[in-house]
Structure formats: structure tokens, C-alpha cells
Amino acid sequence: MRHLRNIFNLGIKELRSLLGDKAMLTLIVFSFTVSVYSSATVTPGSLNLAPIAIADMDQSQLSNRIVNSFYRPWFLPPEMITADEMDAGLDAGRYTFAINIPPNFQRDVLAGRQPDIQVNVDATRMSQAFTGNGYIQNIINGEVNSFVARYRDNSEPLVSLETRMRFNPNLDPAWFGGVMAIINNITMLAIVLTGSALIREREHGTVEHLLVMPITPFEIMMVKIWSMGLVVLVVSGLSLVLMVKGVLGVPIEGSIPLFMLGVALSLFATTSIGIFMGTIARSMPQLGLLVILVLLPLQMLSGGSTPRESMPQMVQDIMLTMPTTHFVSLAQAILYRGAGFEIVWSQFLTLMAIGGAFFTIALLRFRKTIGTMA
């Protein structure tokens, strides 16, 4: 009981110390409010109001149909230009896409000559160029096919394709961006808060107090883990309910308590990583550099930004030893697909094992270095 009382009382002290750190409080509030909202809304996953110019050298019924097929919200109203103005407009950055419809285009299409339409893309606008190129191809092909169908006898297709989008029927990027922002910020804050809590002990000269107190390194670690983990657990739950469900209107298909249990297991592992990094860094700037080196690979390679199946096999195997990979997997399964414990139990078990391993490594490192931190 004495050990539990020490862990509880020192944890309350950590929470009070955090309340006096305005910079950390600002980071916490920003990460789970403004950051979540901006990740869901500022960067669209689909084409949105792309500037486009068209040089219509044919002036036919078909070319007019193509011109009129580009409209909001995917494109701005097309600007009609001449072929000579096309290069200058692209060089000046006025258009992302410039289309050149050649003379006699409709006549050649009806004659079956397969004429070419030139589509120029400003590839420096990466957020629009790749997606927009596919949009334009589909739009032009659709207009040409429907126009030609009126002049030719086309048989009905043998197969009718019905596409149904599961879990996100409207392909709304906000549904994905908001939840992934919370998942990434949970990992970031867990590492930053526990690492900075250890650095604060050194900077404030309170390590000597810990050394003379009747507490063990294990108890000190547990203090950092439960106090900082509780903060992240509470604010992430509030952000999920208030920001994602409330402000963004994203439907949560699965059990929020089950997801929060997964958050707790992930925090056990990531807070241990934070303590390990806190024993290596000698100051807050050093901790910040270490966080950048560790956090970016964890977020980019965990399967949240890019499907793991698209990565090299060696990277997939290495990332299986990281807690974020399994946390992202269970979070997406629960929140997006409504998975129950019978589906995600293996990720829970793996997180427990990885958390235990990281905790043991951090504890050994902490025991070895606590005497030199004073």
C-alpha cells in the first residue's frame, strides 16, 4: 500500500506541475482542437476548385459539351484562352490544368480517327495535379462516349457494375483526417509529456529530492506514466466526442470505451518510449530533436498515412515491433468499421507485449542513469 500511495501522491504532484506549465497546456489544447479540425478540413483529399483553362480550337457541339462539363466544386469555371496563351498562363501559375481541343475534333471523333486532346498539368501543385489528371480523363472520355453513342448503335453492356463505398459512402476526407489527427497526437503527446516531465526534474533540481526519498526507480516511472498518460487519455476522449463527433460530424461506428482501452495500452508503450528518450536528452531542445527523429517514422510508417501493404517488406516487418502500427490498426477497425473485441483482441495482446518490452528497457536505462541526472 505504501508503494501505491507514493505513486498516487507523486502523480498528483506531476499533474500540478503540468498545470503550471503554460507552454505544455497550450500544446495539449492546440493538438486536440485546432490541429484536429485543420487536419480534417484544411487539406482536402479530393480535387477542390482547381483553376483550369481551355483552348477550344474546334468550336463544335462536342467541344462545348466538354467545356461545360468542368464545374464546381471540383473546378473553377474554365477560362477560355487561345493556344498561344496556354504556355504563358502555366508559366505564370494562373492555371493548374490547360486543355487544348484541336480543330475538327468532333468530325474526327465521328469518323473514328481517334484524335488527341492535349492536357497540360502544372505538376508543382501536387495536391491537385495527380488527382485532377484522372478527373479530367474520366470527364472527357465520358462526354465523348455519351456523344458518340447518339450517332452509333451501341449494344447494351453485358455486365453492370455497381460500386458501393463502405464505411465512408461520400468519400469525405474529414472522416479520415480528424480521427488520424487524434491518433497521431496521442503518440506525440505521450512521448513529449513524459520526456519533458523527466527533463523538468533535472532543470528544476528536484532529482536530488527523488534520490533521498524512499521510492524506487520503478515507482518514479509509474508516476510519470500514469499521470501523463491520464492527461492524454482524457483529452483524446474529449476531442473524439466533442471535435470529431460534435464539430466535424463524423459518425463513430464502434465502441468508444473499447477504443479508449486501446489508447491506454498504446500510452503504456509510448510513455515508456518518452521516459527512455528523457534519460538520453540533457535538455528540452535535445528532447525536441529526438522526438522529431522518432515521431516522424512512427507516424509515416505505421499505416495511417500510407497502407502498410504498399511499403517494402522489410519496413513492414520492422514496424510490427512498434506500438503505433498496432494502435492505428485497432483504432481504424473500431472507429471506422465498428469492430468488436473479438476482432481486435490480437492487437490488444500485441500492444501489451510491446508495452511491457519498452517499459522494461526504459526501466533498465532509468535505473542506470538516474544517479547521473542530478
Language-model regions, residue ranges each:
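Transmembrane helix boundary and interhelical loop/hinge segments in multi-pass membrane proteins
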Residues: 191-213, 225, 370
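Long, hydrophobic alpha-helical segments
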Residues: 174, 178-195
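Transmembrane helix segments
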Residues: 37-47, 281-321
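Short, membrane-interfacial amphipathic segments enriched in basic
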Residues: 1-11, 76, 314-325, 374
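Alpha-helical transmembrane segments and their short interhelical loops
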Residues: 33-36, 217-291, 296-299, 342-348, ...
